[in-house]
A protein has these predicted regions:
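Solvent-exposed interaction patches of small proteins and small membrane subunits
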Residues: 1-112
Length: 112
């Protein structure tokens, strides 16, 4: 694996860890997330970072498979190009369902 891909994988992992850090001192509760605009915007920004790094990886090496990469790319595009069309439910689904899987995959890739 080339050094650029490793760096982008670390970017993804760092963004996931930052998102997780918002929930260290409190449980992951949708209502609290929904009411906290600063946390929502910070998470959206980290999803943008994840998407950009993921896009660069896939452009460099199309043989790399990342689960749900298309969904993450699509959500990032909706964040960038239409804030009003990104529902809290969609972002929350990424936080709860997709990021834990992505974190495991990235850690495994970095460990190889």
């Amino acid at each position: 694996m080339d050094n650029d891909i490793k760096a982008w994988l670390f970017d993804i992992l760092s963004a996931i860890m930052e998102i997780e850090s918002f929930f260290i001192d409190r449980p992951k509760e949708f209502k609290k997330y929904q009411a906290d605009i600063r946390t929502k915007r910070a998470i959206e920004r980290n999803i943008e970072i994840i998407r950009e790094a993921m896009s660069r990886i896939l452009n460099r090496d199309q043989s790399i498979e990342i689960t749900n990469s298309r969904k993450i790319v699509d959500v990032r595009n909706r964040i960038i190009h239409g804030y009003d069309s990104v529902s809290d439910d969609v972002i929350w689904g990424i936080i709860i369902r997709h990021l834990p899987v992505l974190q495991i995959e990235i850690e495994k890739m970095l460990g190889e």
